[in-house]
């Protein structure tokens, strides 16, 4: 009888271990996470020991340590379950990042594909191997052929969480506002069109797919690329089937943001979820009102630029900071 009791208890415990109660999804622009090695295939010369930044091993080590500190307590005081990143030079810098002492215990894994971006920076995806298994991933290059520019790929990652549900993650870093937001708008519209095509392709084969979109969009929730081209909803209760709900609309309306430019906050870093993550409350779904910008006093500058995110460099002056963007996150629950 005791043997049967132990067997039943073991089965129950094993099942409980495979239930995903809560998970955090975050995005962080890591601002020029370059190693110190010259790379002939990208324009990274400033981030070398001989370059204008005098970027050496000490600076690189400090950068990794600083970013790991933020990530380690990013989502409600802990490391996120899923983390999209941008402005990384290669897979090696992500491997160095997750190997930091404060992150090693998270047992993270990486998805990364080199992109043709002119600055030599890519997007990436970091996830906890104990929670998520990647099934496949693809990179999609926005069509900027009309301008002869090359930008970051949009990364689509598909996999299963431990309870068996399939999740899709799409990580973005859209073209910058260099030259002005209006002059560069067409490039972000091209990126939005590519993202919309990815969504349509997923839903064609999996109509009830659960999709999470994240990134530095270099546009805000109310801008044309997001509000019109992607047709993203800012009203959770009225999000139609096939639409994305932008969890950061209300934060933009409140005058807050993830990037401070000329003393004005811009909500450039966002996370959106498909309608299926709003309606299916008997499975993994978006936790209402969980959208958050991670901001701590120690992540911000003091003095002349008080309140600005504490970045690695101000021009060519080394500040030993974190990033010029603040990270964002949402919560999922089951």
Regions of interest found by a model, annotated:
Residues 51-58, 79-85, 112-113, 143-145, ...:
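Second-shell loop/turn segments in exported
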Residues 1-21:
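Bacterial Sec-dependent N-terminal signal peptides
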Residues 36, 92-95, 119-122, 178-181, ...:
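Extracytoplasmic/secreted cell-surface and envelope-processing proteins
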Residues 200-211, 219-334:
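Metal-dependent phosphoester-hydrolase catalytic domains
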Residues 15-101, 107, 111-115, 121-123, ...:
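N-terminal, active-site-proximal structural segment of metallo-dependent hydrolase catalytic domains
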Residues 112, 155, 159-250:
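Extracytoplasmic, non-cytosolic globular domains
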Residues 28-31, 86-89, 112-116, 128-129, ...:
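Active-site-proximal beta-strand/loop segments in catalytic clefts of secreted hydrolases
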Residues 88-174:
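Structured beta-strand-rich core segments of catalytic domains in phosphoester-bond hydrolases
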